[in-house]
């Protein structure tokens, strides 16, 4: 929450954390054994919204989730949340195409490039995530 004294990952030592079961957040946490061992307790929930509700009710000190998911939930659901600048792990997204369908891949990439150049991607990002989370392809 915005009024939390947690400002960096180190501040989570001994704290109770919620995350969605079988999520990329859980995988990232499991890959950082020392960090995971430093936590007080980890509560797994069925959904990210359930994890955020645990935070809102005060049953956990923080929620671990993908930044894009967090920004979306904060922007669209509202709430008095903050996202730490420091990440536990980096994650990138991509679009998959049927192997060999280079024509469709190239058309989609050309459209994405045009939207990045004219600022449309940035505008969409700010609308849905509250900030520009786009990544340059160059």
Model-predicted regions and their roles:
Residues 12, 55-56, 95, 108:
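Hydrophobic residues within well-ordered alpha-helices
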Residues 16-19, 63, 96:
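Short, well-ordered beta-strand segments
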């Amino acid at each position: 929450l915005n009024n939390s004294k947690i400002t960096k990952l180190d501040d989570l030592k001994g704290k109770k954390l919620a995350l969605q079961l079988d999520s990329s957040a859980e995988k990232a946490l499991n890959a950082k054994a020392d960090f995971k061992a430093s936590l007080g307790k980890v509560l797994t929930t069925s959904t990210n919204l359930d994890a955020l509700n645990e935070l809102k009710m005060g049953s956990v000190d923080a929620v671990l989730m993908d930044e894009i998911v967090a920004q979306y939930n904060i922007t669209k659901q509202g709430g008095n949340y903050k996202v730490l600048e420091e990440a536990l792990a980096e994650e990138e997204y991509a679009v998959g195409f049927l192997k060999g369908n280079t024509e469709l891949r190239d058309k989609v990439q050309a459209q994405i490039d045009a939207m990045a150049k004219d600022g449309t991607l940035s505008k969409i990002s700010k609308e849905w995530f509250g900030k520009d989370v786009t990544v340059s392809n160059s």
